[in-house]
């Protein structure tokens, strides 16, 4: 154990490149930006990190005193090692704002009683927990496109039967270089979900009701 701690402290602060491999082809490695841009590997697999970053106890304990944005930056920096510090901070700062989440805390923790706490993930613009991921994804994607020298417009196609469609629409709304089209079953979502989607604001969004089911 002591040897592991010495090794971790030795490498702390050094740039260790994280690569991603397909769940269907473990011989091919790509950068984080390339994995984000592609979404799926050519074989249809998912891109997963080649390893889980190791943290020492002091680093983990220090996270408790950080803001949500600071924690997000710290954790993302361990996985998206080809992003610069400025690029990551820009993505985090654009995604997690008080204007979007109604609070600087972003994801407040509510104490019910001794030993019982609730993590509130409904403060995002659509009141769905999926806002936590879909607010930052567009910025990570557009940054990845620039880093891999792609100039084409990104078109996002979404099929949804619930909260994902609205959270995706709100996340990509008016993000430069992107368009998003969401398809949903006409009789397969709640009235509130339908109204949320068909009244979505934004110059780059579109919604289509489909006769049929989600599958």
Question: What spans do the regions from the language model cover?
Answer:
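PLP-dependent amino-acid enzyme catalytic core
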Residues: 6, 14-215
